[in-house]
């Protein structure tokens, strides 16, 4: 959705009232949209199990994007759901998998998390996610 280099002028360092987090691929893992977060120094850290038990906890991204810009880009794709399915863009010899898929809430998304914006019913989209994971 957002190229991390050419769209960087849209990124906010602090959240505004109507801004959405910018999820990066490194923050997501299998069936876990709260795999990691940025600390205040800009380092990525995994979330503890205790933190993940707090269902209201939202991982801190490095950047935020105004909701209107995210809505505009999703509307251009005719996307009406409150969630996104995608996969991490990975290709390292240390990875056991060539695809790590996940579901995230509506948010801004960096270019290393490839989105799958298809017109399936949510139940079929969930089945597809299970198959590709």
Where are these regions (language model features)?
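Polybasic, glycine- and aromatic-enriched phosphate-binding surface used to engage nucleic acids
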Residues: 1-133
